[in-house]
Amino acid sequence: MDKNYLIVDLGTGNSRVALVTSTGKIIDMVSFENEYKRDDLYEDAQYFIPGDWKKKILDGCKKIIDAHKDVKISGVSSSGARETIVCYDENGNDFIGLPNIDNRGAKWMDEIHEKSYIYEKTGRWCTEDFPAAKMMGYRKMHREDFMKIKKITSLSEWIGEIFTGKIVIEPSMACETQLYDIDDHKWSEKICAIYKIPMEVLPEVMNASESLGKITDKISNELGIDKDAEFIIGGADTQLAAKAMNVKVGDICIVSGTTSPVITILDEKYYDEKERCWTDLNLGGKTYQVETNPGVTGNNFQRFKKLMFNDTSYEELDEMLAKKKDFVCTASFSSLNFSQKKSLKKGGFVMRAPFPQNMDLADYALAVLSDIACSIYVQYQNLREMIPNSNDYILGCGGGFKSKYLCHAIADLTGRELRMYEGFDQATVLGCVKLLNEHFGIDNKASTSEPLIYKPNSSPDTLIERYFQEWRVNRNILNP
């Protein structure tokens, strides 16, 4: 018998609440924008007020539940953006959130020694991107508030605490803190000492698909959910998206959203002496996810489209781009040269002078999407250089793949089929559904629909290949 689930999916820019069946059918969905505040004591620091976010989340849940009063909800789960933590005080109050876009620790990274050791044990560079550095930076300028921290957790497990009152963390999120030893699968006392973070603030680790318990009476009464509904632990958004697409050991998958991680799954931990990748724990911590990442990609096009093509559908824009036989400018807006651990601070459009006479707005759109395709392709090349892969296909998922032009461009550059399965644009939500089904003993039936396949162009001289050659030169000029 089918069950119905409530899924909370917290992203970086936007979040959503979905009512979904155990077969993956989305009954209803509510989206909202995430709001951040600046901390002017730092050069680049942002935070959020958990109470403000919580109100939006619960309002979204209630709106959906009220609209579908005849739907019995059996389970609740959550997906969260990585590298973000929520901090609790001694009374269990969530008083501040430090998001992935917060870089408050940057000024003090030179104080951290044994960087190679930290990379080897955590699978991550020793940079301000991760919660260990965020907490260090918080301690530097807000010592009294830092001393109030009695527990932390990730975004996805913060939702679990809202619904059950219990604070835990999933392995796929624990490794994102840079305080978790992915060899020994436990919190690292040595790394905590390096960052001067007390071990006591770190929560119990529980695996995805395990039950955190029944939802509290308070939440049940407030939202109108059945008191027997259980909260089932979710995890990191990238890993959940990969789960939805049935990414197996040896597959390569591009998860295109705010950023576009290029990932592969391995049975054993991978360590790169040149530090050209991140090694993550997969859901449950039983396998490893190796990742390269071009940085911000999807957000760039989302903002561009809102500014220049707000009333144009993706289908209409693809029709415009299909008529283009050449490019007149290149774009550079992706934010990372990943293999060199280098942020790309300068971006823009590069074209020949004087200003081209035959240029229109669609040329800019082509340039931005081509920038995303080329940036992903470079990361695909880097990943295959480290971990050889002879598959004739790549899997893809995420909202970033709404553009057919982008899909064709990636297939042409890589020379591989790009395959996307039903629900690819809602992959994190469907990943949660699969976890819930596993917990309730419901078979996760493989999709009977054929995948959407983009085949590479056999022509040796495609537009995107010509673009790539010039793009590479121009990006290096902008970021020497």
Model-derived features: positions:
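N-terminal glycine/serine-rich phosphate-binding loop of ATP-dependent small-molecule kinases
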Residues: M1-G97, E120, K148, S220-N221, ...
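Active-site core segments that coordinate phosphate-bearing ligands/cofactors
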Residues: L6-I7, I112-W125, M136-S154, G160-K166, ...
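General small-molecule cofactor/ligand-binding pocket signal
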Residues: V30, E200-M206, E230-I232, R419-Y421
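Short, acidic/turn-prone active-site loops that include or flank metal/cofactor-
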Residues: F32, K37, P99-G105, A174, ...
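Gly-rich Lys/Arg/Thr-decorated short loops/hinges at beta-loop-alpha junctions or inter-strand turns
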Residues: E35-D44, Y117-I118, V168-C175, P198-V201, ...
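Short acidic-aromatic active-site loops that bind/stabilize oxyanions
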Residues: E43-K54, R124, E128, V205-S209, ...
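Short beta-strand-loop/turn "lid" adjacent to the catalytic site in phosphate-handling enzymes
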Residues: I65-N100, W125-D129, S156, G160-D181, ...
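Structured loop/turn residues at beta-strand edges in well-structured enzyme cores
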Residues: V71, E200, N389
